[in-house]
A protein has these predicted regions:
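Class II aminoacyl-tRNA synthetase catalytic cores and aaRS-like
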Residues: 1-159
């Protein structure tokens, strides 16, 4: 069931956490890109228009209520996460601006649930154009199309 955003404010976009001090509390919002349950710890890739950020749900740190909610997350759920920004202890992902960082979740709100999308929302989608046009609202979440829209907006506002 979806929850309200009442009283909740985003502190950073996903890619902007690189400017936040380590060990600070951050609140990020976006769509679930991937969710991996490794038994006792859940890894969630959160995506917004700025990029992708890894969120860690560990039952000992976030509590059983938040952990049980995190177990229900699926691709394209819209969520808000509050947690502590930390440097990744394991392998870094050099292809991401936030590849050295993670958020250790202390709170989770599911803002909107989603059915399984008809295609993966990623940079190099091999999906047929006909299907992408049918689900244009999902296709516009892809990073390359978002970049195009931002450039178009900048050009339109400068002329």
């Amino acid at each position: 069931m979806a929850e309200s955003m009442l009283g909740l404010n985003r502190s950073h976009r996903c890619a902007e956490v690189v400017n936040a001090p380590l060990e600070s509390e951050v609140t990020v919002m976006g769509w679930v890109q991937k969710n991996r349950n490794k038994g006792g710890i859940i890894f969630c890739d959160l995506r917004d228009r700025s990029g992708i950020l890894q969120i860690i749900f560990e039952e000992d740190e976030c509590g059983s209520e938040v952990f049980n909610k995190a177990m229900k997350l699926k691709q394209e759920f819209c969520i808000a996460v509050t947690g502590i920004l930390k440097k990744r202890s394991g392998a870094f992902n050099e292809s991401l601006a936030t590849g050295e960082l993670e958020v250790r979740a202390t709170g989770l709100r599911i803002l909107s649930e989603s059915d399984t999308p008809p295609f993966h929302i990623e940079e190099d989608s091999k999906t047929k154009e006909e299907l992408r046009l049918k689900y244009r609202f999902l296709d516009l979440r892809r990073p390359d199309l978002q970049r195009n829209l931002m450039v178009r907006s900048k050009v339109a506002t400068t002329t």
